[in-house]
Curated annotation (Swiss-Prot):
It is an enzyme of class 1 (oxidoreductase). This is Glutamyl-tRNA reductase. NADP(+) binds at G187, A188, G189, E190, T191, I192. InterPro entries: 4pyrrol_synth_GluRdtase, 4pyrrol_synth_GluRdtase_dimer, 4pyrrol_synth_GluRdtase_N, GluRdtase_CS, GluRdtase_dimer_dom_sf, GluRdtase_N_sf, NAD(P)-bd_dom_sf, Shikm_DH/Glu-tRNA_Rdtase. It catalyses: (S)-4-amino-5-oxopentanoate + tRNA(Glu) + NADP(+) = L-glutamyl-tRNA(Glu) + NADPH + H(+). Homodimer.
């Protein structure tokens, strides 16, 4: 049995590649089914966020190259282009990687908590698609437990930092007084919710939430005293917006150069600060060419993020140790499970032989045989039957020169150096 974790992330691939390899929520079930068909496995999950796209697979039949080829073909990339950015982890390394990801140790923002929720969503989607079996199910549960322990036992979650926090921190650097600024937030997901919370806590003058559905926008707006509008209202809202932060799941840009250019004219070229957190991007890159626009992508947030990480570096060392212990413990328990079927079959065979010898002894007693003689024969018969198959196999292994197997058998039967001593009289 083999586990495989492969994919790309913010450290190995540019935003251009990441947005091309991202899965939409609507694609996930179909992609999972294709993946399981390819690997001849019933167990697979896909984690796709703005910073990473990863496949988690239990497999026996295919190597990583075949799965990478499927991923490249699915997203219409050349295999060479994908391979240049991809990483592959197997078995113990795959388990450790998943636990590091869920704990926020592999995130753009060290220790950020959102990734655990995204990992749980990936697990839920895979379960709904019927592609999580007992092995991958155990791995996800162990991963969640490890991430929880990291949060509980280390300070990695203190001094909150995230992509959302980094975006707001950058806005603070550009606008000295956020209380006089107006913000337009595009989207209504988890990241935008965090952005809204940070801006609200900083006392931003006015917040507008634009979303595909007014109902979802209104729910988020109500939480922070903001205003809700539809995506179609964005051009009008741009005129009054000093800060624009966008994070949707749209496959096409929502905000283009023309709309921003028109808004700037009406604003008399008062600057607009924009952060596009989405992958694929919500804001056309050409918008950044405008003189009075400060446009940042996810990749541009690295420097801001670095300033907020210093307090977490020490905690990360302790977290890495917890993850290593968790991964080792999981693999140890998994290997123990591999012996369960063998032990069950051996026990059933032993019980069958016991019952045969016991029935024979009971018949002898019923026929008047001496009880002591019956017990001796029962013990001798049971011993001979239990040792017959192992004896035959050991002689065969010895004839074949399998010294390693003989040494393993000695360990299996706990035959120490003193095992040949005569029993006490």
């Amino acid at each position: 049995m083999a586990f495989l974790a492969l994919g790309i992330n913010h450290k190995t691939a540019s935003v251009d590649v990441r947005e091309r390899v991202a899965f939409t929520p609507e694609q996930l079930v179909e992609a999972l089914q294709q993946l399981c068909q390819l690997t001849q496995s019933r167990e697979a999950a896909i984690l796709s966020t703005c910073n990473r796209s990863e496949l988690y697979i239990e497999h026996e039949h295919l190597g990583a190259d075949s799965i990478l080829a499927w991923l490249a073909n699915y997203h219409h990339l050349s295999l060479e282009e994908l391979r240049a950015s991809a990483y592959v982890h197997e078995d113990d390394a795959a388990v450790r990687h998943m636990m590091r990801v869920a704990s926020g140790l592999d995130s753009l923002v060290l220790g950020e908590p959102q990734i655990l929720g995204q990992m749980k969503s990936a697990y839920a989607v895979a379960r709904e698609a019927g592609t999580v079996g007992p092995l991958l199910g155990r791995l996800f549960q162990a991963t969640f437990s490890a991430a929880k322990q990291v949060r509980t036992d280390t300070a990695i979650g203190e001094n909150p930092v995230s992509v959302a926090f980094a975006a707001v921190s950058l806005a603070k650097q550009i606008f000295s007084d956020l209380q006089r600024s107006q913000a337009l937030l595009i989207g209504a997901g988890e990241t935008i919710t965090l952005v809204a919370r940070h801006l609200h806590d900083l006392g931003v003058k006015r917040i507008v939430v634009a979303n595909r559905t007014l109902e979802r926008a209104s729910m988020l707006a109500a939480e922070f005293g903001a205003h809700a509008v539809l995506l179609s209202d964005i051009p009008a809202e741009l005129v009054n917006s000093d800060i624009v932060i966008s994070s949707t799941a749209s496959q096409l840009p929502i905000l283009g150069k023309g709309a921003v250019e028109s808004a700037l004219k009406l604003r008399k070229h008062k600057p607009i600060f924009m952060v596009d957190i989405a992958v694929p991007r919500d804001i056309e890159p050409e918008v950044g060419e405008l003189d009075d626009v400060y446009l940042y992508s996810v990749d541009d947030l690295h420097e801001v993020v670095a300033e907020n990480l210093k307090s977490r570096q020490g905690a990360a060392l302790a977290a890495e140790q917890l993850v290593s212990v968790g991964a080792e413990d999981f693999m140890s328990r998994l290997r123990e499970l591999a012996a369960v079927d063998v032990l069950r079959a051996y026990r059933q065979q032993s019980e069958r032989l016991r019952d045969e010898e016991l029935s024979k002894a009971q018949r002898m007693l019923a026929n008047g045989s001496n009880a002591e003689d019956v017990l001796i024969q029962l013990a001798r018969g049971l011993t001979n039957k239990l040792l017959h198959a192992p004896s035959v196999q050991l002689k065969k292994l010895s004839a074949e020169g399998r010294v390693d197997a003989l040494a393993m058998a000695q360990e299996l039967f706990a035959l120490g150096e003193g095992s040949t001593d005569k029993p006490p009289q």
